[in-house]
Amino acid sequence: MQFTKMSAFATLALATLAAATPTRRNDSPSNQCNTGSLQCCNSLQSANSASLAGLLGLLGVVVGTITGQVGVTCSPITGVGVSGTSCSEQPVCCTNNAFNGVIALGCSPININL
């Protein structure tokens, strides 16, 4: 009988300890892109947008090859949370920013947790 009580107490104590053990949290900002670079664009448009067609044509971009959205007037975001670095528009991850900030291709909106 004594062994049963001791066994039950040990089981209960271990269960309580396991439930109270702190776990590591990852509170770092999600400021990394899985692919491409983090950008701040003045607008984000569909690749087949009529208002964007002329600009894409001037830059020689074939609309059918674009996946994702197109960011217009983009600048890189570096050092998220650093004083002076801000993005008043939707931050995006873009896979092709080879157009000197005029446009960025393959953009997906992201959430930056500060």
From Swiss-Prot:
Keywords of the record: Cell wall, Disulfide bond, Secreted, Signal
Keyword Signal carried by entry: yes
InterPro entries reported in the protein's UniProt record: Hydrophobin
Signal peptide (UniProt feature, chain positions): 1-20
One Gene Ontology CC term in the entry: fungal-type cell wall
Induction profile: Expression is induced under conditions of inorganic phosphate (Pi) deficiency.
Disulfide bonding pattern of the chain: 33-93, 40-87, 41-74, 94-107
Protein's UniProt keywords contain GTP-binding: no
Alphabetical list of SMART domains matching this protein: HYDRO
Listed GO MF terms: structural constituent of cell wall
Compartments in which it is found: Secreted; Secreted, Cell wall
Protein task: Aerial growth, conidiation, and dispersal of filamentous fungi in the environment rely upon a capability of their secreting small amphipathic proteins called hydrophobins (HPBs) with low sequence identity. Class I can self-assemble into an outermost layer of rodlet bundles on aerial cell surfaces, conferring cellular hydrophobicity that supports fungal growth, development and dispersal; whereas Class II form highly ordered films at water-air interfaces through intermolecular interactions but contribute nothing to the rodlet structure.
Family: Belongs to the fungal hydrophobin family.
The protein's assembly and partners: Self-assembles to form functional amyloid fibrils called rodlets. Self-assembly into fibrillar rodlets occurs spontaneously at hydrophobic:hydrophilic interfaces and the rodlets further associate laterally to form amphipathic monolayers.
Designated name of the protein: Class I hydrophobin 1
Gene: pnh1
